[in-house]
Each structure stands twice: as C-alpha cells, then as structure tokens.
Amino acid sequence: DMCCHPACMNHFNC
C-alpha cells in the first residue's frame, strides 16, 4: 500500500 503523506513518508513510498 502506498503512503504518500508526511505522517508516513518513507524511502520506499514517494
């Protein structure tokens, strides 16, 4: 699942 908001931004999402 993609998570592209600051609460869960990581090196593998955005």
From Swiss-Prot:
Phenotypic consequence of H11K: In MilIA[Delta-1, M2R, M9G, N10K, H11K]; important increase in ability to inhibit both fetal (820-fold) and adult (450-fold) muscle nAChRs, as well as gain of ability to inhibit alpha-9-alpha-10/CHRNA9-CHRNA10 nAChR (IC(50)=0.5 uM)
Organism: Conus milneedwardsi
Transmembrane segments: none
Note: Negative results: is not active on all neuronal nAChR tested (alpha-2-beta-4/CHRNA2-CHRNB4, alpha-4-beta-2/CHRNA4-CHRNB2, alpha-4-beta-4/CHRNA4-CHRNB4, alpha-7/CHRNA7, and alpha-9-alpha-10/CHRNA9-CHRNA10) (IC(50)>10 uM).
Protein name as annotated: Alpha-conotoxin MilIA
Top-rank lineage group of the source organism: Eukaryota
A single Gene Ontology CC term: extracellular region
Signal peptide range in chain numbering: none
Function as written in the Swiss-Prot or TrEMBL entry: Alpha-conotoxins act on postsynaptic membranes, they bind to the nicotinic acetylcholine receptors (nAChR) and thus inhibit them. This toxin inhibits muscle nAChRs with moderate potency (IC(50)=11 uM on alpha-1-beta-1-delta-epsilon/CHRNA1-CHRNB1-CHRND-CHRNE (adult), and IC(50)=13 uM on alpha-1-beta-1-gamma-delta/CHRNA1-CHRNB1-CHRNG-CHRND (fetal)).
GO molecular-function term, one example from the UniProt record: toxin activity
Effect of N10K: Moderate increase (3-fold) in ability to inhibit fetal muscle nAChR, and loss of ability to inhibit adult nAChR, that permits to strongly discriminate between the two types of muscle nAChRs
